[in-house]
Amino acid sequence: MNALIDNPEALASGYLAMAQVFSYPDAGAWSRLTERGLVDPALTHETLEAEYLAAFEMGGGKATVSLYEGQNRPDLGRDGILQELLRFYEFFDAQLSEDDREYPDHLVTELEFLAWLCLQEHAAVRDGRDAEPFRRAARDFLDRHLAAWLPEFRRRLEATDSAYAQYGPALGELVEAHRSRLGEQAPQLGELQ
């Protein structure tokens, strides 16, 4: 993970990989995940899809793990979270996909936005422009959103016997590496909650 710390482009790749992992695993997604080594090819598409549904949609007799920030932070009210996220996206003119139709507080949407901020930072540095606005935005977004609900999400995910449980620590490490790079003074993810 150390190679990620000083490289916003690598951080973006990490966020996009995690976004792929936590996206619905249709046949095409499963192929991409296995080709990139993100999922063991021994785990068939059908099995991965069943694992996804059991973990995030139906529970399979257990409580599901929500992929939505607003459902992981009910004390704040989902409407307020959605409005704040939309303001973040709108400020940077980031458009939500018309095809996916995911809510702004979906884990994948938040991961993709952080990847976009990292890529904007990388482009600014490459082009000799000020990258600090993108760093500040990423720091603020992490503090207000992903890092704020990730501990509870991870706790619940890692308590499942799902194939997805293995990705909780990797996602946590990615976020911590990014926060460390940004000089974050907030508590570590394990200290939150």
From Swiss-Prot:
Its main location: cytoplasm. GO terms for cellular component: cytoplasm. It comes from the Bacteria. InterPro entries: DMSO/NO3_reduct_chaperone, DMSO_Rdtase_II_chaperone, TorD-like_sf, TorD/DmsD_chaperones. It is found in: Cytoplasm. Coiled coil: none annotated. Keywords: Chaperone, Cytoplasm. The keyword Cytoplasm applies. Pfam families: Nitrate_red_del. May function as a system-specific chaperone protein essential for the assembly of an active selenate reductase SerABC. Belongs to the type II DMSO reductase enzyme chaperone family. This is Selenate reductase assembly chaperone protein. It comes from Thauera selenatis. The lineage of its organism: Bacteria, Pseudomonadati, Pseudomonadota, Betaproteobacteria, Rhodocyclales. The gene is serD.
